């Protein structure tokens, strides 16, 4: 499995030896949840599929509450919020037999000094990024890209567009906008400018077939419940509902869409990498609002020391 290059999650049942093998890709892109109950193992790519089994109840224990209110929408690798439901952590394998359960990590990022020059490092990163994108363009289903006009999605779309041109094709790109956005938009640390202008500029430059999906506020609100059900746990409210509606629109014509999600974690795109107040915080940047989150809990649950 160390030789696998790509995203995956799979389960193999060895009937002869009476054991089950589960594995997940290095970054944990593909989900794989499981529950072990009364010598039975239930596994699925979604939590809701496991909860559909009557042996598993939809219960959230103390650990789940802590995960949700201290780290949400992120989750500690291996956790799944619900009691008696776990996930195979990224880059992990598990073997379940009648005798025991074995779990091990087959890969992890090594921490070592980079002796490359700035120019060499830049070229190395470029080679890896281009290779990763081109690998995702191989398939027998229609492929498009998300394009917000930011660095990450623009780089992906530009590389994909060039590859499509080499095949005699035109790349389709999609961006999202909101009704009356030009009237109500306010700059923030996470979004200093509106997407539409820059997305259109990039689309024009790379000569893609671009579509701007416009959503209204009423639809965003109405989709909040569906978005939460789709994720199986509470997430980022309107961010999730807008993504759900955006993907539904794209799904009318495309099965696969490449996006710049998670590039901020790799290339330092979040404000807490540079904002002094966030850097000087005594906790994780995403956990600074724990007090506000706890305010909606009932008095019994408030006693949990979520901060720890």
Residue ranges and their predicted role:
Residues 1-230, 243:
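Cysteine-centered catalytic environments shared across enzyme families
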Residues 39, 98, 185, 191-194, ...:
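Glycine-rich active-site loop/lid subdomains used to bind and stabilize high-energy intermediates
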């Amino acid at each position: 499995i160390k030789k696998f290059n790509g995203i995956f999650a799979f389960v193999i049942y060895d009937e002869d030896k009476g054991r089950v093998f589960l594995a997940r890709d290095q970054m944990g892109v593909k989900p794989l949840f499981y529950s072990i109950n009364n010598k039975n193992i239930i596994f699925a790519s979604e939590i809701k599929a496991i909860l559909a089994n009557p042996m598993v109840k939809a219960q959230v224990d103390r650990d789940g509450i802590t995960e949700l209110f201290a780290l949400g929408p992120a989750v500690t690798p291996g956790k799944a919020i619900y009691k008696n439901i776990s996930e195979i952590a990224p880059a992990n394998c598990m073997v379940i037999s009648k005798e025991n359960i074995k779990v091990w990590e087959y890969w992890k990022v090594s921490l070592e000094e980079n002796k490359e020059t700035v120019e060499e490092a830049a070229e190395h990163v470029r080679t890896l990024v281009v290779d990763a994108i081109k690998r995702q363009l191989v398939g027998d289903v229609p492929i498009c890209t998300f394009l917000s006009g930011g660095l990450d999605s623009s780089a992906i779309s530009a590389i994909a567009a060039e590859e499509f041109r080499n095949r005699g094709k035109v790349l389709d790109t999609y961006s999202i906008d909101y009704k009356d956005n030009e009237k109500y938009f306010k700059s923030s640390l996470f979004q200093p400018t509106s997407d539409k202008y820059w997305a259109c500029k990039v689309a024009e430059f790379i000569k893609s077939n671009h579509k701007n999906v416009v959503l209204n506020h009423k639809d965003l609100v109405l989709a909040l419940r569906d978005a939460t059900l789709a994720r199986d746990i509470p997430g980022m409210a309107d961010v999730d509902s807008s993504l759900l509606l955006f993907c539904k629109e794209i799904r009318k014509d495309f099965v696969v869409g490449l996006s710049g999600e998670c590039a901020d974690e790799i290339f330092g795109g979040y404000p807490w990498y540079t904002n002094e107040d966030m850097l000087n915080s005594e906790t994780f940047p995403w956990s600074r609002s724990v007090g506000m989150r706890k305010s909606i809990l009932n008095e019994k649950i408030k006693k949990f020391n979520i901060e720890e």
